[in-house]
Amino acid sequence: MNKTYMANPQNVERKWYVVDAEGKTLGRLASKVAAILRGKHKPTFTPHVDCGDFVIIVNAEKIQVTGKKVTDKVYYRHSGYPGGQKATTFEQMIARRPERVLELAIKGMLPHNRLGRQMYRKLKVYAGPEHPHAAQKPEPLEV
């Protein structure tokens, strides 16, 4: 009888990838990056272990959306006080904090628990073309 392989958190080897978001569609890019953060692309994937890789996304300000989402997509947040709900459109969000758009899209595609929060920490998003992770020697990833 064969034994099913279970990844051990201490033995997981992590790689660094850099993804250029220029001209890419938001949801398509986010779903592929979320799969890499989870480790679904590895043959050693184990659901209860964080076995994903690190992902750096550059040029977040040049991400695209289809249809009328530029004006119609709304991001909500709440202060916790009565009447404290705030709404921001995609257009306003991309102007003020372009990296937040990608972060929210990818975070929504990860598990909503402790493991998902651990996976989310491996995501690094930058609005421009530069990133400070050259020492990790990230490989370019075409998505």
Swiss-Prot record:
Pfam families associated with the record: Ribosomal_L13
One Gene Ontology biological process: translation
InterPro entries named among the record's database cross-references: Ribosomal_uL13, Ribosomal_uL13_bac-type, Ribosomal_uL13_CS, Ribosomal_uL13_sf
Keyword Transferase: no
GO cellular component assignments: cytosolic large ribosomal subunit
Swiss-Prot/TrEMBL keywords: Ribonucleoprotein, Ribosomal protein
GO MF entries: mRNA binding; structural constituent of ribosome
Family: Belongs to the universal ribosomal protein uL13 family.
Role this protein plays: This protein is one of the early assembly proteins of the 50S ribosomal subunit, although it is not seen to bind rRNA by itself. It is important during the early stages of 50S assembly.
Summary of subunit composition and partner proteins: Part of the 50S ribosomal subunit.
The name this protein goes by in its record: Large ribosomal subunit protein uL13
